[in-house]
Amino acid sequence: TNGLGGYSSLSVIGSLARGDQALLMSAQKAPNVRRHLISNLLETFSMDGTDYVLTSQRMMNQPDLEGFRYLDSFSYDKIPTWTYRIGDVVISKRMVMVHGENTVALQYNIHSEQKHQCRLTLTPMLRFSPKKEEFCEKQQITVNIEQDNLYRIKGAEDVLYVAANAQIQEEPSHLFGPMYFSQDERDGREKQGRTVCTHSYISETETGEIQNDINVILSTKPYTYHEGLFDELLHSRQAYEEALLKKANLTSEIGRQLVLGADAYVVDRESTQGKSIIAGYPFFEDWGRYDDRTGRNYSGHRQTGRM
């Protein structure tokens, strides 16, 4: 979460099980006016001419995407990390959301001791709609190159900037889906949804050599790309969390995890220039103020030094 009401929420295998899950749900006005910018990335890895889809997603009327079959491990040690294995090639993906911004940064690394011709294609699954609303199929989305490695994607009401060390390839706009949201169907919510794809980011590399990481930064602000950008954003997040832990002054590992877990629900409230608490993700909004109705639920925030 980003402390504004925005969030990045995918399943352990990197799929969407609910329509309100998103790779980047931005907060237009903290914390309740939220925009669903990008649902996910369609990730395709090509090795020596053979394509492998790394994305996982249940679909309604077509075969499911089963990238989880190549998923070797998932870990969450401060940030989520997915590791895929195809033959002797290992593809790792790390992701971080910047606190106080509508920014998600991803870093891919492709490694093998053997020589292979590899290509990674990342296709944004764009939604560009208010949270809880469907994608408007009549919406026109344009893609412009702002400068080297910085791209501007504009919809009817939204602008998304992508800074990446990858080449852009535009394609005819087409709908992706419908996707099947199994958890929503169980709860009686809308069980399907679509996104739109207009372009891809492509990076080609040869394994067995010194390799650069593939970095993709998705944001509502334009970042000038440089090779250390992902690390800067990661260190920014880590510094914020270290400050929280220092303030809480807890020594037990469980207590320190509680500090970071509780922080996910503390958000800015723009209308009062103060803080509020989100009742839960991805459905709920904030309680707006502290009162007797909700006070019994604040014990975790008292214990972690957030009150």
Could you say what each language-model-derived stretch is?
Residues 53, 98, 127-130, 266, ...:
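Generic, ordered loop/turn and secondary-structure boundary motif
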Residues 39, 78, 167, 252, ...:
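Generic hydrophobic-segment detector
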Residues 93, 197-202, 275-291:
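Solvent-exposed loop and edge beta-strand segments that line ligand/cofactor-binding
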